[in-house]
Structure formats: C-alpha cells, structure tokens
UniProtKB/Swiss-Prot annotation:
UniProt keyword list: ATP-binding, Cell membrane, Hydrogen ion transport, Ion transport, Magnesium, Membrane, Metal-binding, Nucleotide-binding, Phosphoprotein, Translocase, Transmembrane, Transmembrane helix, Transport
Ligand binding (Mg(2+)): D589, D593
Subcellular localization: Cell membrane
TM stretches of this protein: 63-82, 95-115, 245-265, 275-292, 645-666, 672-694, 711-731, 753-773, 786-806, 815-835
GO MF annotation: an example: ATP binding
Protein task: The plasma membrane H(+) ATPase of plants and fungi generates a proton gradient that drives the active transport of nutrients by H(+)-symport. The resulting external acidification and/or internal alkinization may mediate growth responses.
Keyword Transmembrane helix belongs to the record: yes
Its EC number(s): 7.1.2.1
Tissue: Found predominantly in phloem cells of leaves, stems, roots and flowers. Expressed in guard cells and barely in mesophyll cells.
Homology family: Belongs to the cation transport ATPase (P-type) (TC 3.A.3) family. Type IIIA subfamily.
Full protein name: ATPase 3, plasma membrane-type
Subunit (UniProt): Binds to 14-3-3 proteins. The binding is induced by phosphorylation of Thr-948. Binding to 14-3-3 proteins activates the H(+)-ATPase.
One Pfam entry name: Hydrolase
Amino acid sequence: MASGLEDIVNENVDLEKIPIEEVFQQLKCSREGLSGAEGENRLQIFGPNKLEEKKESKLLKFLGFMWNPLSWVMEAAAIMAIALANGGGKPPDWQDFVGIVCLLVINSTISFVEENNAGNAAAALMAGLAPKTKVLRDGKWSEQEASILVPGDIVSIKLGDIIPADARLLEGDPLKVDQSALTGESLPATKGPGEEVFSGSTCKQGEIEAVVIATGVHTFFGKAAHLVDSTNQVGHFQKVLTAIGNFCICSIAVGIAIEIVVMYPIQRRHYRDGIDNLLVLLIGGIPIAMPTVLSVTMAIGSHKLSQQGAITKRMTAIEEMAGMDVLCSDKTGTLTLNKLSVDKNLIEVYCKGVEKDEVLLFAARASRVENQDAIDAAMVGMLADPKEARAGIREIHFLPFNPVDKRTALTFIDSNGNWHRVSKGAPEQILDLCNARADLRKRVHSTIDKYAERGLRSLAVSRQTVPEKTKESSGSPWEFVGVLPLFDPPRHDSAETIRRALDLGVNVKMITGDQLAIAKETGRRLGMGSNMYPSSSLLGKHKDEAMAHIPVEDLIEKADGFAGVFPEHKYEIVKKLQERKHICGMTGDGVNDAPALKKADIGIAVADATDAARGASDIVLTEPGLSVIISAVLTSRAIFQRMKNYTIYAVSITIRIVFGFMLIALIWKFDFSPFMVLIIAILNDGTIMTISKDRVKPSPTPDSWKLKEIFATGVVLGGYMAIMTVVFFWAAYKTDFFPRTFHVRDLRGSEHEMMSALYLQVSIVSQALIFVTRSRSWSFTERPGYFLLIAFWVAQLIATAIAVYGNWEFARIKGIGWGWAGVIWLYSIVFYFPLDIMKFAIRYILAGTAWKNIIDNRTAFTTKQNYGIEEREAQWAHAQRTLHGLQNTETANVVPERGGYRELSEIANQAKRRAEIARLRELHTLKGHVESVVKLKGLDIETAGHYTV
C-alpha cells in the first residue's frame, strides 16, 4: 500500500482538480471510509495531521533565563568581582564570584524546572482543547482528534467547525466557508460538492461530508505556515516587568554614581574598598528572582484555574481577568440551564384538524435524533417514545440550523409514499416562510408576547407537501401549524452569582438573542435589573422618545442588557465599552461570536462552544454557568495580588539595600561584605519563591498594574527600612545605648562583630517585609501560607545561626552571641509595626480608600454608597412605573443627584410591593399552578422532562 501512495506523499497527483471519483481511486479508498488498521498504516506514511513543532534546545532554554537586563547586572557584578576587585594587594574576590554564579544558576534552574512543568501541564490541558472531528472509520462515525486524520478519511463538517484538513466535498447542500484567515477574503465563500476546502477555514453555514486529500505540512495552510509572521508582541505583562526592572536598575545606578563621586574624589577611599561597596549595591539591589517568581506564580495560577473549569489559552489573560469590570454574558446555558421544556397545555394551534400532540410531533420530526442541540433534545424528549420522531417515515434530507435561516427542516416520505416537509424555528422566519397574512401575524405576535411576559421563548412549526417528490423542489405553499412555548429555567446559582459579581465590582450585562420581554423577565428573576433595550437601539433606531437623546455609549454603559442581539451587535457593545475604558469580558459559543470574542479584553468560550469560538477566545470553560467565571475572576485576582505583592516587595528591597548601605558606607566609611549581601539575597530568594502558593485575599475591586502605587509604596517602605538600618548601625557602633539598656557587650571598635549584627538586622526586616506587602489589612491579621511561613522561619534560623556562631575571616564576620541576637530581633519587631501604617497612608493618599481596610477589611467596588444599590433600585422603579402606566420623571433624571435617593427608595418599595402582588397573581396562572403542584409533590422541575397536572 505504501508504494501505491508514494505519488500522493510526493504530491505528484493534483487531487484538487481531478474528478471526485478519481480522487477515490488515487487515494485507494471509498465513501465508506477507511478501516482502523488502514488509518494507522497511513498515519505512519503521511505523519500526524499537525504542523511541525520547532524543537527547542533545553540547554539554550536554560541559558536563556540568564539573558535579561536583571541578569546582566548580576553578570556584570560577577565580572567585577574578579576583574576589578584585585587592587590594594588583595587577590580577586573569588568567593563573591562563585556566590553570584550560584545565585544565577539557582534562579535559572528554578525558572527552567517550573516553566518546564507548567509547559507540560499546559500542553496536557491544551490537548483537551485539540480540534476534534467526526470521522468515518470501520463503517462507524466517531469523534476523534483531528491529528489522526489521513488522506482517504471521510469526515463530517457542520456549522462552527474548523475544517481539520484539506478536503474535497461530497454530495450535499453547499457550504459557506470563511477563508479569511488563509486567503484574506472578507466574505464567506460558497463551496459545492466536488470543490476543495482548506484546513483552518471555518464552516459558517451548512453540513456536508468530505474526503480528506491532504494533512499536516502538505495542506495549503501547512505550506504557507513559514510565511506567517511568528513575531511575539511585547505584552502588557512584559512591559510592566521591564518598567519595574528599569526602576530598580536606575535606583542602583543613582546609588553607584553617588558612591563613586563621594568615595573617590571627596573621601579618597582605597580602590578595593570602593569596589566592595559597589558590589554590595549591585548584588543586593537587583531583584534577580523577579522574572522567576512572577512566571511561576502565573503558571501555578493557570493550573489552578484549569482545575476550576477555566483553561487559559493566553497566560496574560489572568491579569486582564483580574481587572475585568464588565462581563457581557449570554443568557442561554450561562445564566439559564439550557434544559428546555414545553408546556403542552399552552401550545397554540393555527391549523384546522391538527391537535396539540401533532404540533409537537411535527416539531420533533424537524429535529435531529442524534447529535442534538438543546431544542432538538427538548422536542424529541417530549414525545412518549423518542422513536416516534422517525417512526413510519423515511428521512430524505435534513436542513440543519444556521444563523441566517434560523430554522431546521426535514424532507421525508410517509408510509403511503407521499413526500412532506416540516420545519421548526424562530416564529418570524417561519411566518415569512409561510407568507403569512397580517391577521395571522397579529395573532401569532399576540401569543408570543403572552409567552414572553411569563419568560417563555416561542418556537413556530410549519409543514408542506412535496408533490414533485424531489428534495430540490420548492413544494406546495407552506402552512403555519402552531407555536410552542419553551421554558428555560434560570440556574439555581445565577442570582447569587450575579450578586457576588456586583460585590466584586463586575457589572454583568445580559446579551441575548431572545425577545426583550423574555430578557426583562429573566433579569427580574435573577435580580440583575430590567433596564434592558432591543438591539435596534444600538444602531440609534427605534428608541423610545424618553431615551432618544441618550448617546449609544451611555446607553450601553448604563443598560443591564440587550435583547434580539446578533453577533455584529456583540462586537459593537464590546467596542463601545472599551472606548469608555472598561476592561470587558464577553462569553460566546458560536462561530459568529468569534469577532466579539477576539475584540473583548477577555474572550470566554463557554462549555460546548464550537471550535471557531474556542479558537478566538482567551479562556475556555469546561463547565457551564456563570459561577465558573466569577470563581475564575476571584482566582485571577488572587494570582494578580501575589504578583503585585512581590513587585512592591522587590522595589522596597532595592531602595532599602541601595540607600541603606550607601549611607552607612559614606557617613561612617563602614564597608559591608559583598559575600554577606549574597547570603541575604540567596535566603531571600528561597523564601520569596513560596509566594506563588501563598494564601492571599483577592482584591474586592477590579485590579490592575498601578506602577505609581508600586513605586510610591516601594520608595516609602524601602526608605523607612533604610533609615531604620542606619539608626541601628549608629546606635550599635557609635553609642552605648544597647550595652547600657540590655547589658550586652559593646560592639564599638569590633568591625567583624558589627558586620554580623548589621547582617542579621538587614536579613530579618528584609524578609519580614513580605508579610506587609502581601496583606491588604494589618499584616498580623492575615494568615500567610504554610510554605511562606516555614520558608521565612527556616531562613531566619539560618541567618541567626550565622550571626551568632559565624566566624568567617574572608567575609569579615564574627559571632555576636544570643544576647545581641535577641536585641536585634526585638529592635526589628518594634520598628516593624509602623510599616503597616505607612502602607495604609500611601494607599489613602493615592486612592482615599485604604482606611476602610483598617476598619472592616473591605473596600467598596464603587464610591457609591451600598454598592450603588439605590441607583439600581431607582432604575428598577422607573421600569416598574412604566410597566404599570404610572407617570415618570424625565429619563435624564432617573439617576438623581446625591441626596434625592430617599424619595426614589420609597418609589422602589412601592414598585416592589406591586411586583409581589403581580407574582401572587402569576401563581394563579396555569404555569404558576403547575410549579406549585410540582413543588408540593417534592419533584425537581429542572430534571422532570414534562409533568401533567
């Protein structure tokens, strides 16, 4: 067989142009597909259906972690330690050189191992998102990964699929295919039987089978892949890293410049002493672990998100999710269960001689019996026996749903040999199909409105005979049969999740294709408000007179949702919100949602989304419902909080080391040992690595990188700690305060013992600072993670042991005993407490909200009192008054000035009372009665397919 396929492998046969029957001959296959064994054999010949992956050298990847601006500074310090530090009759500083190299290797090793683990975990997760396809093997259809496809396979292509390989279409209705990613064509191309479709293009309409003619690198896309620009854009996260790194490097440069100017021309210090002082600033000031800590934190966070049912395709989407303040959510399946049921008693029949059960049967016949969507499953499931949907008939042709026609249809032959068609779909489309008269349209619209007031969707059914007995014929005129009510109950957790979202500062807007009345009713039930508008208002059309003067941007920003929405409206909503500086999330599941998902800051493909929607999204949900998204927001904020905590810590330590040791060196000409700074840096890095798993409180508001806050906090905290160290040095080295007060031995005149004391003081406070930066409230009230706590105490036991017992001549230290160690710990603890107060003061100056953290550990997501609940109640009251025909104030004054809420609260309370009365009335309707009886009998209305009272 291999020799027979050589021409195909070498591309000597033009499978794109030859007749379709010759394609089967050349590929040595049939319309029945390949066998499993033949598929495996061909996989060895043609290779997997994926592009070649670039193999990266592990060694080069490892060395790459030493190639960034922060590492360059450390490498410069290492060279300096042996090339420049050999003056004054002293040998090169080999200890510092080896220590710096060890520090670089340790950081690179941790980065390499963690990124490798994260990469493997991400690869495993992404494998679950790998494109899948329906393939015919061994005479059976099954869903397989697209990578196993080989030339000769028969595949099924339907709406929303990304075409898995180059293929020729077989018999069936034409497809509409979006090839813009490959050819640049903006409009979908129509492809009929026998024509070629390319791998990577998206099916926009239709359903058909095809024979695969090329896979992997042999496809049109595979050949062009090397032309695709693979340049990585510098993301926002990388820009932040660069800005913080540059700030630290500039701070060190300032410190070094001041030291050089003062030490050599003014103080005329020895060359080697000056080099040691410069090494201290270079080694201690550079946050060498920053890229490692932040990358590891993000990788671990991404893994945690996947465990919660949210797979991140783009790592930096985590920081955008943390800052999201508007979520545009689909209704069906996200806010509701997408478990549809039909109340038979409410079915309206418009055709003489037809019973309600027959309307249901027609709807079931116009549904799939396999590979069903929610509506198909509901229709077939309502039959006494699902087999009735195809009982006594022979299926000729099924027209699948598409976003343009918004209907499905089945052509079939009955037991008498007569041809018929039935169709179900959106009422407006079915009415147009039947060329319905004005009086019929009026009656149908009245029924639809009646359903909508109860939150029920409408599905219309029609039928026709086909005298010509061919599937291509138009048939006799269509007859409008009836309308069915569909009830899609809200998820049990949706109302609570929306309340949580509001408390977190995320405004949830419902974006639905359903009618306005249904959207308002669902919004009312979920407590998200009924301030909703039809999609036509987005284009400035059909606005009420009261809101005609409101700009579209304001309308989108203030609305609780929009109904009757098409994909182009979703894109417009996202665009306008982004223009108003909102960080916007958008959920979607269909191929037509892809542009809006791409445009949104965070595109979220919901569970069971099409391949096209998944491809355009940043985050793919593996579980249904809004609660997954809100959990992901909380987790993202926790991840972001860890990263922000570390950056503040890194800036603070740089300022503290640079200016603390610079002042000591210049004022008292005391030269701290570069080796001891290395020990501090190594212990700090070991402790700080655990921050990626720290227990943190997520921010109660949408969070983002605020460099002003990071730098301001870092400078103030670092400056305070530098002064604290300088004061300690002065008190211990130049006065008898500590010996007189605590009866410890005098360190004056003993430089080596002073070195040990100074080392311990710097080590304790440097690491203790992380507890201040990691907490939003008092640092001693927010319990840290166990790993961080253990790492801190282990590092401090080592540091204390070195200070107490160390006697290293090369590092110029000598043990100071437990008495001095206790004094230094006491000094550090006493001067630790003001750090929290300074943190609050900086936040208060910058944002004016930090004092709320001191009082109740909570920051409101808005400056409005009670989370703006009064404003929402006022809008809700406005809608209720309109509903009941009461007089309203001008729309422009719906949101009043401060102080006018009391009156509106009273209006809201009155409206609520009227709403409660309306609900009581609703209980006396048939649907309300059914729900009451079902509840009394202890049945679950969500799981019950249907119930008869």
